[in-house]
Amino acid sequence: MAYTIEEEQELTAIKAWWNENYKFIIVCFVIAFGGVFGWNYWQSHQIQKMHKASAEYEQALFNYQKDPKAQAEQFNQFIKNNEKTSYAVLALLDKAKIAVENKDFPLAEDALKQAMAQSNDDILSSVSALRLASVQFQLGQLDPALESLKSVKEQAWNSAKNLLAGDIQLAKGDKETAKKSYQQAQENAGALEQQLIQVRLNNL
């Protein structure tokens, strides 16, 4: 099992957007809630803090990608130090991706459950839930996989969500429900994806 090109592109886009916009987010927060008092100090402190977290994330990921086993403790420490932040969630998604590549699906499942628990962002939560369902499907955990798909709230993932639901339902022997899920997936899919889904429908 591997993540789709669309999933990887979406996660890359999320990372790029965050790196480009986190300063603006901080400014908006201060204007809305901070008032004028302490503006310069608070702005400087938060930007330095975010720069530090970003650099630490990139370094931790670089080291972990080179040798996951040797760097596991340090990578987990980074996640702990940045608990409940987007960087922790992104690190957990990266950890799961590498685990899947190494066919360590239980480790991937654990990382994705942590990502869901730590995420306060609908997009990251949806990505985490979709990937968790994929891993659980790979592990033969069909009912938990369907349950995880309920946490995919972002509409951009509706096609992928329904497609995976159809695959899981088909594995459970429920062809009628699988057919409905595939048809729903087709409604939001691109041209190529529609053709691939039609193949599934034709084989029911």
UniProtKB/Swiss-Prot annotation:
Q: Which residues lie on this side of the membrane: Cytoplasmic?
A: 1-23
Q: Where in the cell is it found?
A: Cell inner membrane
Q: Which organism is it from?
A: Aggregatibacter actinomycetemcomitans (Actinobacillus actinomycetemcomitans)
Give GO cellular component annotations, separated by semicolons. Answer: plasma membrane
List, alphabetically, the Pfam families matched.
TPR_21 (PF09976)
Keyword Membrane set for record: yes
Main function: May mediate protein transfer from the SecYEG translocon to the periplasmic chaperone network via its periplasmic C-terminal region.
Cite the source lineage. Bacteria, Pseudomonadati, Pseudomonadota, Gammaproteobacteria, Pasteurellales
User: What is this protein identified as?
Assistant: Ancillary SecYEG translocon subunit
Chain ranges sitting on the Periplasmic side read: 45-204
Domain of life of the native organism? Bacteria
Topology term for the membrane: Single-pass type II membrane protein
Quaternary structure note: Interacts with the SecYEG translocon. Forms a complex with PpiD.
The UniProt transmembrane annotation reads 24-44
Location (main, coarse): membrane
Q: Which UniProt keywords apply?
A: Cell inner membrane, Cell membrane, Chaperone, Membrane, Transmembrane, Transmembrane helix
Q: Which GO terms describe its molecular function?
A: protein-containing complex binding
Q: Can you tell me which family this protein belongs to?
A: Belongs to the YfgM family.
